[in-house]
């Protein structure tokens, strides 16, 4: 980099105080993102909903299931405990329906957390930034969509993903079932994709 490049970059630096908290924040580490995302989640004055993943592994191998520092199960992007609220900024971490733009990295806001009479969360309604994202999903599940149609809520359901219990061949596989979402006010610069950042 030239001295002029450095000068230009330094002229673009802003302090945290001057940044709108709702704009997308890029950080270097998952820990920094988690701190910011949890702080933003705590600002929303509605009840917190915690959804635990269902994790299965062959008998005697459950202790081999690894949970990363940021809560991901095995080598998947699904989290062991998903903490969300209506109004939370989220992104998909799994290709739900690629031709319907419900792809890994698609971002939006939670407009509904639908529970059964027993309190089981059966789907999460997300208003995606790209209005056409989820059109087919909304048509496929008209009853679920109708509840959140005024806010263009697309129903997102749990998905199951398999993962290896270790790097060794034939070490066994486990499965995790969880909503393919994560908080997204902040993301690592590594995970950001220009196509997913709307103006």
Roles of regions detected by a PLM:
Residues 1-100, 115:
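Conserved helicase motor core of P-loop NTPases
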Residues 96-97, 102-199:
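Conserved helicase C-terminal RecA-like lobe
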């Amino acid at each position: 980099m030239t001295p002029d490049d450095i000068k230009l970059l330094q002229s673009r630096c802003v302090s945290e105080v001057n940044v709108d908290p709702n704009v997308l924040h890029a950080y270097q580490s998952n820990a920094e993102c988690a701190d910011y995302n949890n702080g933003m989640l705590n600002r929303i004055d509605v009840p917190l909903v915690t959804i635990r993943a269902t994790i299965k592994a062959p008998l005697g191998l459950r202790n081999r299931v690894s949970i990363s520092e940021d809560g991901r199960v095995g080598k998947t992007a699904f989290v062991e405990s998903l903490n969300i609220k209506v109004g939370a900024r989220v992104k998909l971490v799994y290709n739900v329906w690629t031709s319907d733009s419900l792809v890994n990295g698609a971002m939006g806001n939670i407009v509904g957390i639908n529970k059964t009479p027993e309190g089981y969360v059966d789907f999460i309604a997300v208003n995606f930034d790209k209005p056409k994202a989820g059109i087919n999903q909304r048509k496929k599940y008209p009853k679920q969509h109708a509840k959140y149609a005024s806010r263009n809520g697309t129903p997102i359901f749990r998905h199951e993903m398999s993962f290896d219990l270790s790097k060794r061949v034939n070490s066994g596989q486990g499965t995790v079932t969880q909503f393919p979402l994560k908080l997204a006010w902040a993301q690592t610069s590594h995970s950001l994709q220009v196509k997913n950042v709307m103006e």
